[in-house]
From Swiss-Prot:
Keyword DNA-binding among record annotations: yes
Keywords, comma-separated and alphabetical: Developmental protein, DNA-binding, Homeobox, Nucleus, Transcription, Transcription regulation
GO molecular function terms attached to this record: DNA binding; DNA-binding transcription factor activity, RNA polymerase II-specific
Compositionally biased spans, kind Low complexity: 62-74
Protein name according to UniProt: Oocyte-specific homeobox protein 5
Gene: Obox5
């Protein structure tokens, strides 16, 4: 009996394997690809070919695609687009040339500017004819000179302000009293008179206390307490009948220029003047009469 065509050894082995075991053996990749293409319509032959490529081949394809995109991006721009580009030269506006005036022309214009900063149309026309320029140029010159004049005035005002501040400060310092000297001389705790004064000013007393001031001025110079002593803070002040010492307060605070001052007459004078002038009791009686 003639034998059939001989099969490949692998096929013979596969045919001898039972059906159950054959179903468990994985199929070849080609058959799997064909089955996947038939089942999923989204899979294209190009994608299957790319997936079957090795990693170096994929990298080469990606580099080629990137190079082509770069070449397309670096294509020369059209002339129309180049003309629309804005460069530093294109952004500059067209500027007219400045009109240059001679010294005589400037002198003439300055003379008319000093007379009138806002000339009328007739005056502008006359100046344009005499100078040899257009009316617009004359208007521009007057406009620029007015702005320059305002700037100069503003600078002069700013320079004058510090000087005026210095003068006012000097005046305030000259009128500001360096301190006040409250002097209290009392008998049994009663104040005699009060007032305010500085080194460069006379004492300021209330109207009800002017009579006591006149009493102080009328007394003898040896027995009275001189104003210089009070200003220096060395006034010898004592009490009269009770023998108690008077409270003398000397305030040197510069900020308090109008502090109340209680001025009293000193009962005890230097020892060499005890015998001259009225006694302390007589002076005390006069002060009480004035009140």
């Amino acid at each position: 009996m003639a034998e059939g065509p001989s099969l490949h050894p692998k096929l013979q082995v596969a045919s001898n394997i039972p059906i159950e075991i054959r179903s468990q053996i994985p199929q070849e990749p080609a058959r799997n690809l064909a089955f996947q293409m038939s089942q999923s319509p989204l899979v294209t032959p190009g994608s299957t070919m790319q997936s079957s490529l090795s990693v170096p081949e994929r990298n080469l394809l990606q580099q080629e695609s990137e190079g082509s995109s770069r070449q397309s991006g670096s294509m020369p721009l059209s002339d129309k687009y180049v003309n629309k580009q804005t460069g530093p030269m294109a952004s500059r506006k067209f500027r007219k040339e400045r009109t240059v005036y001679t010294k005589e022309q400037q002198r003439l214009l300055q003379k008319h500017f000093d007379e009138c900063q806002y000339p009328n149309e007739k005056k502008i026309m006359e100046l344009a004819v005499s100078v040899g320029v257009t009316k617009m140029e004359i208007k521009i010159w007057f406009k620029n000179n007015r702005a320059k004049y305002r700037r100069m005035n503003l600078q002069n005002i700013k320079q004058a302000l510090p000087e005026s501040n210095g003068i006012s400060k000097a005046v305030s310092e000259s009128t500001h009293f360096p301190g006040s000297i409250p002097v209290v001389a009392s008998d049994n705790g009663e104040s005699m008179c009060s007032g305010t004064f500085g080194e460069d000013s006379m004492p300021k007393f209330n109207c009800s206390q002017e009579s006591s001031l006149y009493c102080f001025q009328a007394c003898d110079g040896d027995m009275c307490c001189p104003q210089e002593y009070l200003l220096d803070g060395h006034a010898p002040v004592t009490a009269w009948n009770s023998g108690q010492s008077a409270a003398v307060e000397y305030q040197t605070d510069i900020a308090v220029a109008e502090a109340p001052v209680r001025l009293a007459y000193a009962a005890q004078a230097p020892e060499d003047a005890h015998n001259s002038g009225p006694s302390a009791d007589e002076l005390w009686q006069r002060i009480l009469e004035d009140f």
